[in-house]
Every structure is written in structure tokens, then in C-alpha cells.
Amino acid sequence: MNDAKYVVVRSVQFKKGYKLAKKQGKDLPLLAWGVNQLAQDVPLPSNWKDHQLKGNMKQYRECHIGGYSDWLLIYEKRDTDLILYLFGTGTHAELFGM
């Protein structure tokens, strides 16, 4: 039974970040758990620091996967068509060029 409210759509950038995270040995089941929570419209734990981005990325939200300080998920919930759009995953430097 699939009780997800949102259909998950992965961007090319997210897919590349996912492959890199796999190569780096990151905890991919933890990422999958977070995506599943978001798809079911369940709030993430507070240590994930889920927040709205600002500036030219203000339509997206960002969270720290598992509470790690430098492993991020950038996403957008599109309520009009019930899509959870996964924009990217990676470190601040990988995602924002810092």
C-alpha cells in the first residue's frame, strides 16, 4: 500500500548528487526515509533543520539529512499537482559552489 500524498520527481542534479553520495558511502536508507516522510507529508525531526531557502531559490526548502551539518536535501512540495520535486542532494559546496 502506498500512502504517499506526493509523487516523487527527481531532477538530473538530484540523480547526480545521489550517485556521488552512494560513492562517498553516505547513509542512503536515511535519505530514502526522509524522502518518504516528505512524500507522506509527515514533518521531519527537528534535528533535520528543515527550512525555506531565500533569494533566487526561495521556492525550495532545504533540510540536513539525519541532522548532519553538511549533507543536504533541497526539495519543493508542489501542492497544486501533489509533486515532491527533489532538486538536489550533497554538501553546501557541491550544491551552492561554496
Question: What feature does the model see in each segment?
Answer:
Residues S11:
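Residue-level signal for threonine
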